[in-house]
């Protein structure tokens, strides 16, 4: 499933860079698109604002098909306290903008599966696909608005995975 998870993340990352090139994060001295995988980073004291954070939650396997299909639930968490220039009063607009970006990043609902353990990445035989994100309600914590969206990511296991 690691190849599917990596391919899903890289697809969202490249799509975000095209949709909103201004949404970035400085991470380990490098500016990159504002999306990251929580399990691949050092632990946070608090999640970064105005960044999409991917969390992998649960794994399922269907062995009754001709090929083994695996599925893992992905939660995408994001939050905003607005901008300083508006004193944070635009935090709702900022969160809505991130909602729209997430909807756009998720489409189309598939991407080629690549093996990122090799340089350059190797294209595999199958695709990674997912369903529409299901959005949770907005959580309010003082000046911070946050939301999470969940979706299932699917992939057929290939030989050697």
Language model segments and positions:
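Charged, amphipathic alpha-helical segments and their flanking helix caps
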Residues: 1-161
């Amino acid at each position: 499933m690691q190849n599917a998870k990596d391919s899903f993340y890289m697809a969202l990352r490249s799509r975000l860079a095209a949709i909103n090139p201004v949404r970035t994060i400085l991470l380990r001295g490098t500016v990159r698109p504002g999306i990251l995988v929580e399990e691949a980073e050092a632990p946070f004291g608090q999640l970064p604002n105005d960044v999409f954070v991917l969390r992998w939650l649960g794994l399922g396997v269907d062995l009754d098909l001709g090929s083994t299909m695996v599925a893992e639930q992905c939660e995408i968490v994001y939050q905003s306290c607005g901008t300083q220039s508006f004193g944070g009063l635009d935090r709702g607009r900022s969160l809505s903008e991130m909602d729209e970006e997430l909807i756009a990043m998720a489409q189309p609902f598939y991407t080629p599966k690549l093996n990122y353990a090799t340089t350059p990445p190797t294209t595999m035989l199958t695709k990674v696909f997912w369903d529409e994100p299901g959005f949770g309600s907005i959580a309010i914590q003082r000046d911070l608005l946050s939301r999470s969206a969940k979706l299932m990511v699917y992939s057929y296991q290939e030989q050697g995975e």
